[in-house]
């Protein structure tokens, strides 16, 4: 049964997405204070009563400070639980440790499962995320998980900002072929595939194009951009095969390491990321970066969850 009131919480840093969501819902972020003492320990307090309230905690987790953001989120969840909130939903658009979803070598942990366990132990009742790197992570939880998709927002962006009828959708690897094919079908476009062989993580040794991109605007789609070395090499391969131009659209712009340098020095015309990850400072250093705002999708998911409505509408449709 829906609760009587919504409370939105966000950490003191990287509140941009949370503020956009709150504005779309016509709400204010609930007063709270998160402090870090000289020893590095974190304390958190909520500035008003949340008893019997429907709590939504919105966090953006990017590169460099992942563990700090995770611990802050766990503390905020637990604080809400001990303050007698009726339901606590963690909105984590970029789910941390999603690439550690399986035991890929001896004595390796499955850290994505550990993340799920910690969230539920802290008191989380529901999780909303976006474009999980591995969809099976939903099965790690003992509470409901809604994995939203950036695809409707991406389709809208392409139709409004790209001459898409003269385009082709590109998958940067075999694993993303289904994503690329689905997007291509929605736009009634062809798609091509780049087969890549990795020498080690984040280092591609060879790339082979499967498909014809002659005189086409190539739109590379992926769930995550990390160091962007793969995207830069993909752009070179596509242009060598007579593509007209190349842009990349990714859900999670982690942009770690030399990502900005790689983008600036690449033959990519544009790299478009959603704001699941905070990268406002990086945009100032890279004129090729652009943003797709997904706050409307998150706001509508909150409204629907609070009112007991289906969220599956958002899997294929942009919020009205």
From Swiss-Prot:
Keyword DNA repair, does the record have it?
no
NCBIfam families in the record, alphabetically? Answer: PRK01259.1, ribP_PPkin
Location in the cell:
Cytoplasm
User: Any one cellular component term from GO for this entry?
Assistant: cytoplasm
Under CDD domains, the record lists: PRTases_typeI (cd06223)
TM region(s), chain numbering: none
In the UniProt record, the gene name given for this protein reads PRS3
List the protein's name: Ribose-phosphate pyrophosphokinase 3
Q: Matching InterPro entries, A to Z? A: PRib_PP_synth_CS (IPR000842), Pribosyltran_N (IPR029099), PRibTrfase_dom (IPR000836), PRTase-like (IPR029057), Rib-P_diPkinase (IPR005946)
Pathway(s) where this gene product acts: Metabolic intermediate biosynthesis; 5-phospho-alpha-D-ribose 1-diphosphate biosynthesis; 5-phospho-alpha-D-ribose 1-diphosphate from D-ribose 5-phosphate (route I): step 1/1
Query: Which residues does the record give as Mg(2+) binding sites?
Result: 131, 133, 142, 146
**Which SMART domains does the record associate with it?**
Pribosyltran_N
Q: Which family does it belong to?
A: Belongs to the ribose-phosphate pyrophosphokinase family.
Q: Which reaction does it catalyse?
A: D-ribose 5-phosphate + ATP = 5-phospho-alpha-D-ribose 1-diphosphate + AMP + H(+)
Q: Name one GO molecular function term.
A: kinase activity
| Gene Ontology BP terms | 5-phosphoribose 1-diphosphate biosynthetic process; purine nucleotide biosynthetic process; ribonucleoside monophosphate biosynthetic process
The UniProt disruption phenotype note reads:
Cells fail to arrest in G1, cells remain budded and a significant fraction has a G2 DNA content. In such conditions, deletion mutants have a disorganized actin cytoskeleton and actin accumulates in one or two intensely staining clumps per cell. Deletion mutants also show defects in ion homeostasis and cell integrity. They fail to grow on medium containing 1.0 M NaCl, 5 mM caffeine or when incubated at 37 degrees Celsius. The caffeine and temperature sensitivity are rescued by supplementing the growth medium with 1.0 M sorbitol.
Enzyme class, broadest EC rank = transferase
Q: Which domain of life is it from?
A: Eukaryota
> According to its UniProt entry, what is the function of this protein?
5-phosphoribose 1-diphosphate synthase involved in nucleotide, histidine, and tryptophan biosynthesis. Active in heteromultimeric complexes with other 5-phosphoribose 1-diphosphate synthases (PRS2, PRS3, PRS4 and PRS5).
Q: What is its EC number?
A: 2.7.6.1
Note whether Membrane occurs among the keywords.
no
Which Pfam families does this one have?
A: Pribosyl_synth (PF14572), Pribosyltran_N (PF13793)
Keyword tags: ATP-binding, Cytoplasm, Kinase, Magnesium, Metal-binding, Nucleotide biosynthesis, Nucleotide-binding, Transferase
